[in-house]
C-alpha cells in the first residue's frame, strides 16, 4: 500500500484495492522490495488496470457496450494472466495507439509495465512459467531534434 500522499490530489495514491490481487501484490513489491517511487508504482498500477479492462472486454467478460472506464478491473486470477498470449498484447498495443491515441512513448511505458508484471509473475513469485511479453519490443521512438536556445 502506498503511503505517499499528494496534498493536491489525496485520492491519487490511495491504497491499491481496485485491481486483481496479483496486480496489488506486484505494486506493493515495486514500492517495498524494488524501491520504486510511489509515482512509478501508481503509474504501473494504472497501466495494469487499463490492461485488465481491455482484456475483460476482449475476452467477452463484460457487455460489449460497457464504457471502458466503467469496467471493473478486479476479479482476474493468476490462471487468467497465464492465458494471455502475445497476440493479446499486440491487440492491446494497437488499442492504445489507435483507439486511445497514445504516443509511442506512452505505449512503450505501458508495455514496460506489462514486461515488469510478467517478469514478477514468472521470475519473482514463480506463479507462471511463460512470459507473453518476453519477445515483444517497444515501438520505435521518433527522433526529436534538439532545440537550441538563441
Regions found by a protein language model. Name each.
Residues 2-13, 23-39, 48-145:
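N-terminal core-binding DNA-recognition domain of tyrosine recombinases/integrases
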